[in-house]
């Protein structure tokens, strides 16, 4: 959600825009993100709260407000903002991600894990979102699932050998259910088969020269 450049202070730009009368939603939102990106969480909350009151159907503004409230130390207000916004925009990806991050920060990783699973059973995750799910599972003590998600992260990044390593760790995790064990093993078999197919497609070094002799 926070799109302000971390290396560039955009506050002066937005202050100038607003001073010139360009004070629409975009300018005010940009001003808040610039404040948040440079340590002005309290100022960002004030601006975003006003925008949120006027545009309660915007998950983008709600997500930014919740994040700003977390940064300002207003944890209860942030969690309430996220909860209310998700009722209006269930499974909104940026909003759910920010809410999950907030839950992890306050020690509610298991809720974050469940929330992310629900989201990504309906929306295909990016590699970084898979990694976040792994972090949530690990923080919740769901070790086997955490390794499994990291295997999926490596698959998404094209590193199948690392995926196999993570699946081996997943299968060695304690307290697995039979369903988990079967799921992890099935995925392991799929990945190993993919590695085997890939190796067969690649010619051996010097293979072409040998064939031409």
PLM regions and their residue ranges:
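Short amphipathic alpha-helical interaction segments
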Residues: 138-143, 155-162, 176
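Extracytoplasmic and endomembrane cell-envelope/extracellular-matrix remodeling and assembly machinery
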Residues: 1-84, 115, 159-161, 165-169, ...
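Structural marker of alpha-solenoid helical repeat scaffolds
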Residues: 20, 54, 88, 122-123, ...
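Alpha-helical adaptor scaffolds
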Residues: 59, 63-144, 148
């Amino acid at each position: 959600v926070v799109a302000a450049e971390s290396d560039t202070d955009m506050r002066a730009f937005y202050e100038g825009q607003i001073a010139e009368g360009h004070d629409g939603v975009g300018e005010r939102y940009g001003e808040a993100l610039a404040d948040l990106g440079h340590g002005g969480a309290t100022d960002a909350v004030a601006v975003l709260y006003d925008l949120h009151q006027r545009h309660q159907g915007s998950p983008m503004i709600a997500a930014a407000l919740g994040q700003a409230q977390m940064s300002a130390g207003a944890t209860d207000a942030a969690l309430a903002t996220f909860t209310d916004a998700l009722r209006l925009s269930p499974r909104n990806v940026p909003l759910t991600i920010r809410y999950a991050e907030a839950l992890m920060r306050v020690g509610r990783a298991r809720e974050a894990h469940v929330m992310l699973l629900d989201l990504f059973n309906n929306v295909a995750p990016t590699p970084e979102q898979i990694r976040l799910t792994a972090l949530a599972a690990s923080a919740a003590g769901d070790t086997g699932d955490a390794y499994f998600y990291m295997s999926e992260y490596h698959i998404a990044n094209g590193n199948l050998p690392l995926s196999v390593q993570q699946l081996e760790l997943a299968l060695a995790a304690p307290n697995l259910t039979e369903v988990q064990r079967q799921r992890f093993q099935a995925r392991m078999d799929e990945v190993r088969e993919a590695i085997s197919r890939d190796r067969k497609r690649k010619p051996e070094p010097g293979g072409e020269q040998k064939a031409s002799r």
